[in-house]
Each structure stands twice: as structure tokens, then as C-alpha cells.
Amino acid sequence: MNNIDILILFFVLLYVGIAFILKVYINRLNGKNIDKLVLSDNIKIVIFVPETHVDIIIEALGKAGAGCIGCYDYCSFATKGIGRYRSLEGSSPTIGNINEFTSCEEIKIETICPRNKVAQIIRITQKVRPYETMGYDLYPMLNLSNNF
């Protein structure tokens, strides 16, 4: 197992615990059974990039198989924000200088991908990223079954 596989396993196990707690809590609130809430086959991926690289990243995500929802592909959502960091000794910052605090406009790209393609999609995206270190988040997703 590599580090990404271990991270994915951690998030799946985390989901199982959270899903159980949510089921118990919601059942107590309204007495309804939510057993039809199921773990999705997809993972939500969130990536932070400068505005200049949004199209490059979205293209890489789509080509790798991310962003498929029903009869649509290349699906994503983007929001603008401010990224903040300090580059430490030994780094090669794309924006800013070593040992200085830097703030820059970034775009947060959100999309989904099949759980079995997460590691591949992250590796492909890391090849086209502009930053030395790519910031990203992975979230397990819940869906309602068709009979709910």
C-alpha cells in the first residue's frame, strides 16, 4: 500500500463511523429510518490553484475520469478565495519568497471521481499543477438510494 491508498482507507473508515453516528442521531430526531443512505462510489476532490491554471487542471481532471455525473462529464464547481502560506527554507515558491508570508488569489476546484481512480487522478493532476506542493482535499460522499 502506498500513502495515497492508506489515506483513502482512512477516509473510508472515517466515513463509516460518521455515517453510523449520523444515522443514530437523525433516527432519534425524527424517528425515520435512513438506512437507505449509502456510501457513494465517488469521492469529492477539492484542489486549490491560481486562476491562471484552472482550465489546465480541469482538463487534466476530466481526461483522467473525474467530473462524471450522470450523462455529463468534466463537471466541476469553482470558487475564488485567498490562499495564505509561508515558504520555508528548502522550498521553491511559485508565488512569494522564502520566509515571507504570502497571500494570493486562488481558485478552489471541486469535482468528483470514482473511488478506484482517486490515486491515479491525484498523480495526473500533480503533473500539471503550478505549485511545488499541491493542496487538495478528499471527501467520502453519501448518496440516497433510489428507493428512499
Swiss-Prot record:
InterPro entries: DUF34/NIF3_sf (IPR036069), N-reg_PII/ATP_PRibTrfase_C (IPR015867). Keywords: Membrane, Transmembrane, Transmembrane helix. The keyword Transmembrane helix applies. GO terms for cellular component: membrane. The chain crosses the membrane at residues 6-26. Disulfide bonds: none annotated. It is found in: Membrane. It comes from the Viruses. It is a single-pass membrane protein. PANTHER family: NGG1P INTERACTING FACTOR NIF3, PTHR41774. This is Uncharacterized protein R836. The lineage of its organism: Viruses, Varidnaviria, Bamfordvirae, Nucleocytoviricota, Megaviricetes.
